[in-house]
Amino acid sequence: MVENSFCKKEGSPVVGDRINVKDLTLAGLERLLTGMGAERYRAGQVAIWVFQKGAESFREMTNLPANLREKLDAAAVISRPEILAKKVSSKKDAVKYLFGLPDGQAVESVFMKHAYGNSVCVSTQAGCRMGCRFCASALGGLTRNLSPGEIYDQVLGIRRDTGERISSVVLMGSGEPLDNYDATLTFIKNVTAPYGLHIGCRHITVSTCGLVPGIRRLAREKLALTLAVSLHAPNDRLRDILVPVNRKYPLTELMAACRDYAQETGRRVTFEYALLAGVNDRKEHAEELVRLLKGKMPCHVNLIPANPVPERGVKTPSRLQVELFKKILERHGLAVTVRRGLGADIDAACGQLRRKIAVMGERLNTRG
């Protein structure tokens, strides 16, 4: 394990009286360095060291003058990820990580191997306040937002641990990305930049449970990001229960925002639909889903056989039920996939490993 020096204040790029450079964009680095009397181009050099090469100290930045490195050491820090726990799937196609934060919180990330490359699923918040019924992340509520650097460190930490190239990122771990909008956008700008990992926007997926103002704000950025909407129900009555934010932003508003997003960005919208046994997986639900989506916008439906969450009473549907649901959608012309089951044996659903470790800690403390 390495020493951790993440941001200690929510929403602030300051560690004590020093700035965490991973919380800054290139423009922010330029302001920092020119304020030290350095030339503007030095910011690009620092950015490459930090966001692309994964440098953990300013001493590594050998193309910077020694006096500038000393000034950076005095005014700034480079946060470093600390792996608290790691679980590898039996098929070796997924690795679940639990990263520690300096305030004692922990966040989850998942490394996934696909035929087309390697992807990382990152968290944007410690916990979540959206309260989705089937999600383990929401069980403890929201603790705090992550800083841009804390999000970025999940990617760098996994890259360092696996030695693998990361070709795509999904913001689909613990938390609601659009509920932590500014940090999410800063992370995206850095990870897609030439000075960062240079991952194309089309290979970045932003997941949301349906925060309509956030979707509209993201559309105005005109970035070719993939928007993944956690739909999970074809009508307001059921969605009000499964995804409580629907009570504030019902399906009519959500669908309108999604149509506008597709129009503004030229990207089709992905609708995530977690199939919960006996809850939303029946024939009538599939037919309602067709009526909701067909012909409304360029879209794709991703069916997700739910991971069991005993605390929520969530059960996984049978393979036959999943296939029947899929065939109904396909018969009506919708583009459908069933998410490949990566990491079910490593608690890869949102919040499961974090909660399991926390419960273990509580038991140990009780015994002590």
From Swiss-Prot:
Which residues does S-adenosyl-L-methionine bind? G175, E176, S207, S230, L231, H232, N307
GO terms for MF: 4 iron, 4 sulfur cluster binding; metal ion binding; rRNA (adenine(2503)-C2-)-methyltransferase activity; rRNA binding; tRNA (adenine(37)-C2)-methyltransferase activity; tRNA binding
Q: What is its EC number?
A: 2.1.1.192
Radical SAM core domain location: 114-345
Write out the annotated subcellular location.
Cytoplasm
Catalytic reactions on record: adenosine(2503) in 23S rRNA + 2 reduced [2Fe-2S]-[ferredoxin] + 2 S-adenosyl-L-methionine = 2-methyladenosine(2503) in 23S rRNA + 5'-deoxyadenosine + L-methionine + 2 oxidized [2Fe-2S]-[ferredoxin] + S-adenosyl-L-homocysteine; adenosine(37) in tRNA + 2 reduced [2Fe-2S]-[ferredoxin] + 2 S-adenosyl-L-methionine = 2-methyladenosine(37) in tRNA + 5'-deoxyadenosine + L-methionine + 2 oxidized [2Fe-2S]-[ferredoxin] + S-adenosyl-L-homocysteine
> A single GO CC term, please?
cytoplasm
Taken from the record, one Pfam family name reads RlmN_N
Q: Which cofactor does it need?
A: [4Fe-4S] cluster
InterPro entries, sorted: Aldolase_TIM (IPR013785), Elp3/MiaA/NifB-like_rSAM (IPR006638), Methyltransferase_A (IPR040072), RlmN_N (IPR048641), RNA_MTrfase_RlmN (IPR027492), rRNA_lsu_MTrfase_RlmN/Cfr (IPR004383), rSAM (IPR007197)
Q: Which cysteines are joined by disulfide bonds?
A: C121-C350
Give the family per the record.
Belongs to the radical SAM superfamily. RlmN family.
Q: What does the function comment of this entry state?
A: Specifically methylates position 2 of adenine 2503 in 23S rRNA and position 2 of adenine 37 in tRNAs.
Protein name, per record: Probable dual-specificity RNA methyltransferase RlmN
- Encoded by which gene? rlmN
